[in-house]
Amino acid sequence: MRRELLLEKIDQLKEIMPWFVLEYYQSKLAVPYSFTTLYEYLKEYRRFFEWLQDSDLVAVERIADIPLDVLEHLTKKDMEAFILYLRERPLLNANTTQNGVSQTTINRTLSALSSLFKYLTEEVENEQGEPYFYRNVMKKVSTKKKKETLAARAENIKQKLFLGDETMEFLDYVDKEYQVNLSKRALSSFQKNKERDLAILALLLASGVRLSEAVNLDLRDVNLNMMIIEVTRKGGKRDSVNVAGFAKPYLEAYMGIRQQRYKAEKTDTAFFLSEYRGLPNRIDASSIEKMVAKYSADFKIRVTPHKLRHTLATRLYDATKSQVLVSHQLGHANTQVTDLYTHIVNDEQKNALDQL
């Protein structure tokens, strides 16, 4: 979704929200949470508040008029009823008779609500320096996580990674072969954005940065001589990230056409640009997601930008066998998250079984 459209949809949701949600929004914007995350959270709050109205747990016609004390006095049974509603309600916009949403969707909804309740009961301060209320019903609500061993998860992910020579083969494919079967119209669009798209793919594969970190890169954040970029990690922390050398020619090629191709002025600080209505704009996350999906599906298998992050992490662990190094590269505070990559590249167990 383009940034302008995303902000427009956020404004539409903000117009119907209670005052305390608007305060929450401003607080999380300062963290900073991404606009995409806040948009998804606002949608979850709308769904929850509409359920409160339909269930007669609040006697107001407008969501904006929902009082704060309604949230304070919600019971565990109320929240369990909401979860059951999510499990059993008919799916919308789907050609299926199946009811209910997935457990992943339910967990996402509960995560959004937990964030709001934590803000109201722990983080915000009233005039007396106290939170708005203390009773956090979300702490009594348990979520059901998908049961899967690291080995099983690793095996599933491994099929969607471009390991070994496939990293460069993927970039070469986009560079030289992807355009062969395109229509004239598609070819024109591809050629206009080819250098930019290759630079984005190469950066993701060579640094392992998150999608949001790539989107928010500014010109001043990129040092092509040192092959280091400055990014804003989760929680707003700034971090220096090394970039593998194979990305340099792609990044330099993009820089060579950036100003003229996208009509960039000195005020256009975003590193990766798109053109919208003849004007340069910072490329949005949705455009990168669609671009990665398009090229990867044509090459081998449809993947997400996050799988390119997994690809870098797996290749780096395979080369160094250092979880600490991989953790630092990805911006993780500890090595627990990187346990997955040891399973992806660990063939010792399979080799031992082959000897039986």
From Swiss-Prot:
Keywords, comma-separated and alphabetical: Cell cycle, Cell division, Chromosome partition, Cytoplasm, DNA integration, DNA recombination, DNA-binding
Keyword hit for DNA-binding: yes
Tyr recombinase domain location: 169-354
GO terms, biological process: cell division; chromosome segregation; DNA recombination
Classification via SUPFAM superfamilies: DNA breaking-rejoining enzymes
GO terms under cellular component: cytoplasm
Entry GO MF terms: DNA binding; tyrosine-based site-specific recombinase activity
InterPro entries membership: CB, DNA_brk_join_enz, Integrase-like_cat_sf, Integrase_catalytic, Integrase_recombinase_N, Integrase_SAM-like_N, Recomb_XerS, Tyrosine_recombinase_XerCD
Residue span, Core-binding (CB) domain: 16-121
Subcellular location: Cytoplasm
Record text on activity regulation: FtsK is required for recombination.
Active site, renumbered: R210, K234, H306, R309, H332, Y341
Family: Belongs to the 'phage' integrase family. XerS subfamily.
Free-text function comment from the UniProt entry: Site-specific tyrosine recombinase, which acts by catalyzing the cutting and rejoining of the recombining DNA molecules. Essential to convert dimers of the bacterial chromosome into monomers to permit their segregation at cell division.
PANTHER family found in the cross-reference section: PHAGE INTEGRASE-RELATED, TYROSINE RECOMBINASE XERC
Name used for this protein in its record: Tyrosine recombinase XerS
Gene it is expressed from: xerS
